[in-house]
Amino acid sequence: MKFFFPTLVASALLMLTGNTDALNVKMHGVNYNSRKGPDWAPDSSKCKSASEVQKDMYALKGITDRVRIYSLLDCNQAELVLPAAKNAGLQVHLGIWTTKSHDYLLKEKAKLASLIDSGLYDNNVIGLHVGSETIYRKEITADTAIGYMNEIRSYIRSRGKNTPVTIADVIDIYYDYPQIVDAVDYISVNEFAYWEGVDVNEGAAKTLDRIRAVRVTAAKKNKRMVLSEVGWSSGGYNAKTGVSTPANQAKFFSDFFQVARSSNMEYYWYTAFDSQWRVTNGGEDVEANFGVFKEDDSMKSNFQQLTIGWKDPRAIRNAGSNRLLSEKDAGLYMSTKSNDWLVKEQQTWFFDSTTKQIRSKSGDRCLDAYQPWDGGIVHVYRCMDNEGNQKWTYESSTGKLKHATHQGFCLDTDPAQGNKVQLYGCSPNNPNQKWVIINPANI
């Protein structure tokens, strides 16, 4: 269930209090693997049974309406997941695993044919990716990957299936090989701020930074962009990110969820269940802990106790210049009304009445002022709930945005310096310090 708070400055709540027993929002989609054992184990130990898969699907229905898998063949999971997902009310995004061997593609293709023949492949299938990070792993070239995808797409079209088909890979592959963008039906990118060594407070912001250019490309090409893998680990140690904790996983999800919801972003959380078999298979400890659920299908407590509230989008207009406070590439500027979707995002902010933060939609960073003097710098910085430089209060009677920590100072613009955004001593009836908070739809 989603909770909405239609107030002017609605709070986004991140509470780990133990007062709830389930995640109160639904994810767009979740990645799933029916594996439970390492590569070398016999199928009885390596693969979940039909009843175990069905149990998983019922658990996932509580947090999403879509599930995404990576292979038709591995653990025979397509044949098990498709009926189990339908029973649970879940749509399925299928995956075909690719390697440097075209013979393996033919095996997956043969399984695809049998799924169509049996009727398991029906309108409940909403997407199909051919390959997952195969180019990134340097097993095949981009052109080979496109060839594989075209082969599968041509086949399903010949069978009367219009399912959109794509290639899933890390975002840099899409940047390095633009021909992939033209070839796919929609863009499917994997992006993990976690592996890039950023502080969790900037995890969602880093994700936005990394995908911004491909979002622009997708809009220009009139194609959807799906974030096919995104997530954060709750345990283990990574040299770049440090110690992973349940609290940090919950923090990243909460921040990212708000970002995705505000932009109607399609994404698949990585991953559904913790998977100790990945460590047995030779992976790092952190790789076992990306799940929402434990391996026994119980929801992890950091998700179970997480309550996410609704944040209303707002625009901030200066009365003196009649321009809008805007953020681009971590910098502030004042802009006029625009029909460009990217500029509209830059002009949109979220007020958090609990933390007193003002967070940008386009960058997921907070309005920050660290120089308490006239002309002091105001910028955006990674949001930290207890950071005094990020505390603001809006005085509706005067239209002033007052700094809650640096008493006597207000958000100000200087027309003589190109409407520079700055901190300045609060003064009465100053149009450069008068701000109107409005719904972006009313700009």
Q: Each predicted region: which residue ranges?
A:
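Fungal secretory targeting signals
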Residues: M1-A22
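Substrate-binding cleft of extracellular glycoside hydrolase catalytic domains
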Residues: E79-T163
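Aromatic-lined carbohydrate-recognition surfaces of secreted/lumenal glycan-active proteins
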Residues: I156-Y175, N222-V230, E266-W277
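Active-site clefts of carbohydrate-active enzymes
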Residues: F192-E196, K221-Q249, F273-S275
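Lectin-like carbohydrate-binding module/patch detector with strong preference for beta-trefoil
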Residues: W310-I443
